[in-house]
Amino acid sequence: MNHRQQRQLFLENLLVGMNCMFHQMQKRSINTCCQNLQKILDRLILLQTIHSPAFRLDRMQLRQMQTLACLWIHQHNHDHQVMLGAIKWISPLTKQ
């Protein structure tokens, strides 16, 4: 598996994991929900990158995805196809 494939798989696992954890939480309000999503994403980024030197430089870029992830999860009501589309759009390595 080359670096591009590894990074794509990493992003997909990260966002799918975030979405699964999001569904387990109580959603009291948009603000609380987004704050919790950002905490979850921060934790997942750290867990996925802490032992992987190849992905350490991606942390800043992944953290910039937090707000976007919150927005599209809310906007599209957790639609799986939209999530996959957003992963492809977010990752510059998947553009043709």
Curated annotation (Swiss-Prot):
CC annotations in GO: host cell mitochondrion
Keyword annotations from UniProtKB, A to Z: Host cytoplasm, Host mitochondrion
Subcellular location: Host cytoplasm; Host mitochondrion
Similarity comment text for this entry: Belongs to the rotavirus A NSP6 family.
Complex and partners: Interacts with NSP2 and NSP5.
Protein's recorded name: Non-structural protein 6
Top-level taxonomy: Viruses, Riboviria, Orthornavirae, Duplornaviricota, Resentoviricetes
